[in-house]
Amino acid sequence: MLDLRKDPLVRPPHTGRRLAVAFCSLAVLLAPVAAHASAPAPAGQRGATVSAGTGLAQEKRLKSWGNNRSGQLGDGTWTDFRTTATTVLGLTSAEVVKIAAGGGGAANGHGLALLTDRTVQSWGANGSGQLGDGSVFSHNAPGQVVNLSDARDIAAGGWHSLALRDDGTVVAWGRNNYGQLGNGTHNDSSVPVRVEGLDKVTAVAAGLHHSLALREDGTVWAWGHNANGQLGDGTSAGRNVPAPVNGLTGVTRIAAGCDHNLALTGQPGDGADPTGGNAVKAWGHNATGQLGDNSTVNRYTPVDTQGIWLGGVAHIAAGCRHSLAVTDSDHKLKAWGQNTSGQLGDGTTDHRITPVPVPGLKGVQLLAGGREHTVALLGDGAVRSWGANGSGQLGNGTTTESSTPVTTLTALTGVDKIAAPVGGDFTFAN
């Protein structure tokens, strides 16, 4: 039998590396499976390390950079951090459908990858069972989530994870102190459990201690922590089963920050395109203006983000305390909320309570927000990032923060997916 205490890919719980820092720090398969602890990854799967400003390795693989104190980079090491891209062991780019990053502090982070065979791989911190492998041992290389074989979407929270199944139901695993697993209890689970009362779900999202689901009818359902109104039900009472967010219909996209949320909808509103385009709705924590409603007042039901409509909105994303949107007509970026480390990318460190443009970026296709950094994928496959960089999460070979975008990976690398944890300081690209 494998001795987990001696395996280099496995870290037992309760080591100093696993200290959970709850500062507002935060985007499946029924078969006999080989869990994380089965064996080290085969030789030759490590791949080549990529330096800043270079293309991906010839054999394209999932890449990671930034904090690695809990093995969240998945490269088979416990190296504290990496300032340039390394390779996640054993996962080729071609087999990865979606990636998700979770975490709630410098010493806590985990990753998820949805594969073409509909299974989910996980790695990193696991003190609350957030890897879903039936253990609470951290792992620095991917292993399979157990008892799920039909995933179509994934999300990673601070210490918990979610997966949407083919039948439209949702499963969750990991920490459950606030009911964020949605199964009617407050008991942690190291294996997937079904979220109660949800069907016909099309997408999921996870905050630091809460969860969201978008249903086919355009409604949004929420559960978990609610001290700042992040469940959007008009109260501050937590819920361990899902409940609808008040007044939201026609929603097409959702995003979760540490304690706030965004929804993209075609509903008219003060922040919507007067020509009939869509609107961004926001609710929850608002101390640094992350709701974009020209205030710093927490909102317990959705409000309109102001001045975002120019050309419509194509994509939304949330960091811990900041928010992001890409305009539909010209794929330019707007940002608002906390800007302590320059994560808004506007060349300042001033918080913004309404959206401001990020200069110098065109053709933005996807966005990801971390605790205090932001990542953008451009149409040519290039990755740009900005904000905090103390753990190398910008991937440009330094630990110097930047309030304007810097180059992480050059154009034409074939990248089409990015992820960052709303409560953490690392990044994935595939």
Model regions and ranges:
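Eukaryote-biased RCC1-like beta-propeller repeat architecture
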Residues: L2-D3, P8, P12-N430
